[in-house]
Amino acid sequence: MAKVTAGRDELGQFAPKFAELNDDVLFGEVWSREDKLSARDRSIVTVTALTASGILDSSLKFHIQNAKNHGVTAEEMSEILTHAAFYCGWPKAWAALRMAKEVYA
């Protein structure tokens, strides 16, 4: 996985420790443990967790794109979010599916 610098780019001046943890720990360490869980599977977990939490903003779109980049197909993403709808709520899944439709267009 390519080095992530979004934390430093977006929040480095305002919240340097948060930016460091985002870039170096979350993306630098956790996401790089592919011997434990593949980046593809981490992407699926992340998209599902964000949807269930109601985080339906640019971060969800980023992670849907990330899932696509890690090999999750449009058909799989549709099924993942349809399945999640029954556990996280129909409106959240609806919003996530619309976002996924844009990403996979």
What are the language-model segments listed below?
Residues 1-41, 52, 69, 93-105:
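Acidic, glycine/proline-rich low-complexity segments that act as flexible tails and inter-domain linkers
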Residues 27, 63, 86-87:
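Aromatic side chains
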Residues 56-78, 82, 92-104:
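Extended intrinsically disordered, low-complexity coil regions enriched in Ser, Thr, Gly, Ala
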